[in-house]
Amino acid sequence: MRVVVLYGQMSQKKSVDEQDGLVQVESVANALSALNHDPVPVSFSLDVKKTLQLLSSIQPSVVFNLVESIDGRGHLIHLAPSILDAMNLPYTGAGTDAIYTTSNKVLAKQLLRGARIPTPAFVTPEDVGRKQLPLFKPCIIKSVWEHGSVGIDADSVVFPKTSEQLTLEMSQRRYQLGGACFAEAFVEGREFNLSLLAQNNDNTPQVLPLAEICFENYSRDQYRIVDYKAKWESESFEYQNTVRTFDFPAQDRPLLAKIQKIGKECWKVFKLKGYARVDFRVDASGNPWVLEVNANPCIAPDSGFVAAAHKAGLSFQHLIGRILYGPIMQFEDRCFPESDTFSWKIAVNE
């Protein structure tokens, strides 16, 4: 079966996180080959017409969507599934709406609030001057659109004394955060990642083993956050001292159950498909707070999602097969409407 492995066009600088995306593409393509499929890597560029023509000429049975940004810009991520929808092409992972609502962190937090799912309080630069702002001490300045801890560093946690000072902090940091940012109440405490994998029969998520990120050897004046260094710079203190664990004492069972329940609620609220990851902080009182909902999280071999899959007994190849066959099962025995460019039927076993 011909499978397009779609990924976003890289920016000219090709940052470390973008380079990791290329590792992800190669690894997925190799797994597809091992599953006796014909993978065709395709870069999704801002030249949408060219991308359309290329996809039309390849005529894949399904698209493995690995687009995380386009030309280094996270706010364009929803263009890929939108184009695939317009072409009636089945693709892996979340749909257009879910990609858009989860990639816009402010919108995602508004939806979480509407669903009464706990998420830390936040303000945007646009809120300043329009209403009385609560001042969070401390708070963390985050990007609206960029993921993978882009722009997050040790100075991202701030203690604003006035709304003007908070506005200044956001203004000074917004460029390194992709141009749009917001301030979120910083939750002191533990950090957890919950990975969810669709079960092909009805898209009900399988909850993979819960992971905690442990901050080892951090001094008292260091904020325990998974910043850019902790995620991407392998020689840094932060990277080497943020350790993932799947082992928990018995007294954590009620907390883990609560986190799993909230994670499954997020799956429903955002209408997720395929695979997702929900990031949590847990405060000193044991209350979980949703930081982010990640549709189509990184599935490079060294990623947290793959580590959770391995803990559940799934090999990388098995994981890729599970993700791939979700859209195939949904499109089985279904013919695409004829168009000026192409028409074909999905075959589960070619």
Placement of each model-derived feature along the sequence:
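Active-site nucleotide/adenylate-binding loops and adjacent lid/helix of ATP-dependent enzymes
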Residues: 1-8, 26, 56-57, 101-190, ...
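ATP-binding N-terminal substructure of ATP-dependent carboxylate-amine bond-forming enzymes
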Residues: 1-90, 97, 103, 127-131, ...
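Hydrophobic beta-strand scaffold residues
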Residues: 39, 90-91, 119, 139, ...
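Generic structural signal for residues in well-ordered beta-strands
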Residues: 39-42, 91, 122, 181-183
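A short glycine-rich, hydrophobically flanked beta-strand micro-motif that places a catalytic Asp/Glu
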Residues: 44, 181-185, 192-193, 271-285
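ATP-dependent carboxylate activation and anion-phosphoryl transfer catalytic cores
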Residues: 113, 203, 249-350
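Phosphate-binding site of ATP-dependent enzymes
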Residues: 162-246, 250-261, 289
